[in-house]
Amino acid sequence: MMELQYNGQGYSKRFSRELVALMCAGAVSGIDWRRSSRRRLRVRDARVFSRLQRCSERYFWPDGTRFWCHARKRRRSPSLPARRPPTPREDALEDYAKEYGYDREDGEIYDREDGEIYDREDGEITPVYTRLKSLVVK
């Protein structure tokens, strides 16, 4: 798992997901959105990691500021003990959440078998590109 810092603190995670989907098609599935925040992206795939870094400084947020992201440098303090691996209980909870659909946030974007990116809103599944047509990126 790799981490990227980015300047999405002024927007919701949902909007950040849509912007990332617009910038880098296919990158949304390579990001762990449940463990990401509005300042930090947890990326599962090295290819997605490098694609997002290439998108840095090329796109703009709606308020006109540039989208930027860079690798987060992990510095360990010598006084802190090493982090222990996740307990089996945490893995069991994650498996349960995936099995019963609790792992998705409300309105989360997901990939289907046909390669289209869809959004679940008000119980209706709609393609994301229909809502992104009005979004202008310079």
Curated annotation (Swiss-Prot):
From start to end residue, where is composition biased (Basic and acidic residues)? 87-96
Please give the superkingdom of this protein's source.
Viruses
Q: Where is this region: Disordered?
A: 74-96
Q: What is this protein called?
A: Uncharacterized 16.5 kDa protein
State the organism's lineage: Viruses, Viruses incertae sedis, Naldaviricetes, Lefavirales, Baculoviridae
